[in-house]
């Protein structure tokens, strides 16, 4: 499945992008919102939505306190989305996981490294830390500094079915295709890149079709 990343300034604009999109799921980046009025407009689409409110340190668009982010997470959980995504190193990770479990909403626990792709054992340590919180999906995203980084992060798929792992940057595009084939879902842009090297939904579908035809 392909997740289209929704970058919008409010719920109404997010709805417009979802309606015109061709993805299977949509990640709504709440850190891009300038206002949280009208969040209920997203409720009809909730079964196909992943809500995330990234902190500034995790690549979020703006600074927001943990308490503000937690309040917004609680509001979107009332819409019963498919998932909420919260950063492993966020100060509210455990609380968001707990709130989501009470609502029976899926949890994506994420880790982003915008500088490099750490060595494999450090990546494995991230996975182990995530597993302690028992998320439904573990998302590990790093920055590719070499083509070899694609293969290193792909090793995280060995023996795991709930991992989404890939590299950002132009050197990491191979890992995005690997992710599309091995992960429960992977991410693509609707109209503008949410991360360096991100493919569009159309580009990713085309690439998957080519690889599929070659089997």
From Swiss-Prot:
Binding site for 3-dehydroquinate: 27-29, 54, 176, 198
Enzyme Commission number(s) from the entry: 4.2.1.10
Annotated metabolic or biological route of this protein: Metabolic intermediate biosynthesis; chorismate biosynthesis; chorismate from D-erythrose 4-phosphate and phosphoenolpyruvate: step 3/7
InterPro entries in the record: Aldolase_TIM, DHquinase_I, Type-I_3-dehydroquinase
Top EC class for this record: lyase
Active site: 112 (proton donor/acceptor), 139 (schiff-base intermediate with substrate)
Gene3D superfamilies: Aldolase class I
Keywords for this protein: Amino-acid biosynthesis, Aromatic amino acid biosynthesis, Lyase, Schiff base
GO molecular function: 3-dehydroquinate dehydratase activity
Reactions catalysed, as given in the entry: 3-dehydroquinate = 3-dehydroshikimate + H2O
Gene Ontology BP term (one): aromatic amino acid family biosynthetic process
Family, per entry: Belongs to the type-I 3-dehydroquinase family.
NCBIfam families xrefs: aroD (TIGR01093), PRK02412.2-2 (NF002683)
Subunit structure: Homodimer.
Role summary: Involved in the third step of the chorismate pathway, which leads to the biosynthesis of aromatic amino acids. Catalyzes the cis-dehydration of 3-dehydroquinate (DHQ) and introduces the first double bond of the aromatic ring to yield 3-dehydroshikimate.
Protein name: 3-dehydroquinate dehydratase
Gene source species: Thermococcus onnurineus (strain NA1)
Taxonomic path: Archaea, Methanobacteriati, Methanobacteriota, Thermococci, Thermococcales
């Amino acid at each position: 499945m392909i997740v289209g990343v929704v970058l919008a300034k409010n719920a109404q604009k997010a709805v417009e992008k979802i309606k015109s999109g061709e993805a299977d799921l949509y990640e709504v980046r709440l850190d891009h919102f300038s206002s949280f009025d009208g969040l209920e407009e997203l409720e009809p689409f909730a079964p196909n939505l992943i809500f995330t409110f990234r902190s500034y340190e995790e690549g979020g668009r703006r600074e927001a306190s943990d308490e503000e982010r937690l309040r917004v997470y609680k509001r979107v959980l009332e819409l019963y989305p498919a998932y909420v995504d919260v950063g492993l190193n966020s100060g509210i990770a455990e609380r968001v996981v707990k709130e989501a479990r009470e609502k029976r909403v899926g949890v994506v626990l994420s880790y982003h490294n915008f500088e490099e792709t750490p060595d494999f054992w450090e990546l494995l340590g991230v996975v182990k830390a995530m597993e302690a919180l028992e998320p439904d999906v573990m998302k590990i995203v790093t920055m590719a500094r070499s083509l070899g980084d694609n293969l290193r992060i792909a090793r995280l798929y060995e023996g795991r079915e709930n991992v989404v792992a890939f590299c950002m940057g132009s050197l990491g595009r191979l890992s995005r295709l690997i992710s599309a084939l091995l992960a429960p879902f992977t991410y693509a842009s609707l109209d503008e890149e949410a991360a360096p090297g991100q493919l569009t939904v159309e580009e990713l579908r085309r690439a998957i079709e080519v690889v599929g035809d070659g089997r």
